[in-house]
């Protein structure tokens, strides 16, 4: 959900967005929608988080629990470290996981259950902006400490924890004439915000780590339960997509019509899908609010908001007529190791459709002459990254990062000592 963090939130943009309510944000939380669509999502496990763990994520500094001597599936050069690795035995009692040992144990067990490698996220956001600190420079986590390191280094995760309802109104704040009441007492508003944040049922989502082909991930925009438009998520040019465009659009439209259109509680939302070869099955990756905070990628929000929403004509017939058929003998949902063996078999079948369109959603791809179409080496989320010396240390293996952290600790200790002496 943190995809468009460089843009101010709320209605200050002047764009004619529908009113963004707190219930809309909660409906886009992974823990809310995953049970509904589990059979069409990649394999994942959800771990409820308590206040102690959330306080750990919010706390300044990165202190990791002591590392297991031989964590399952971890390489010798994994680059994962604990700040207590080089500490004195007397410091062993500084273990942050003491306050959430059950969660720590659940995370260990879940990593093992999902094959030894997982990709983490919180309710809305994955820590993609923090992969610079990972030894593999991606979301792959083999130990609990890998997960904690990514979560505590991520601005996206901080947004989930501190700003989930920014730009929203409560479901009772909207007046009958459609105008939104504005709180004028800042103290009361701050207190209300803190209370709301504390009521969010935060979860750690651990998804089985698989290598997705980024060229086959797509973002889809829904208004009034109509699929308006869709586009690539990856901003590079892939020539082969143009030959697949019509087939991909049909498959995604059918998936939306049958799976999401009448089952998601809100009429306006944005969803991400993955359509791997042989391109006959659609996987739901994420659901985001139809709001400025969601990155429109190849579109602008002004374009999307100005698109005409297809509606019923005077005769009551829809602009789009579809005849849907369920194909027998379809592949199981665990093909390519993506799906969940525990999903109900009835929801695993592929869907085919004989389709007649009078409204066709625009499917935007990156053109070959786009000046930004070949930025394969361009780093993403650069606004959230740290200085070069930190990045270089993270890339030099465990020795380099441990040395950097030791120097960092020395600097912090020296500054604390200077502050104490100055205040004496």
Curated annotation (Swiss-Prot):
Cellular component annotations (GO), alphabetically ordered: cytoplasm
List of residues binding Mg(2+): 286, 288
Amino acid composition bias (Basic and acidic residues), ranges on this chain: 325-334
Record-linked InterPro entries: CDC123
Residues at which ATP binds: 121, 124, 126, 128, 207-208, 217, 219, 233, 272, 286, 288
GO biological process, one term: eukaryotic translation initiation factor 2 complex assembly
GO molecular function: ATP binding; magnesium ion binding; protein folding chaperone
Function: ATP-dependent protein-folding chaperone for the eIF2 complex. Binds to the gamma subunit of the eIF2 complex which allows the subunit to assemble with the alpha and beta subunits.
Protein name in the entry: Translation initiation factor eIF2 assembly protein
Origin species: Ajellomyces capsulatus (strain NAm1 / WU24)
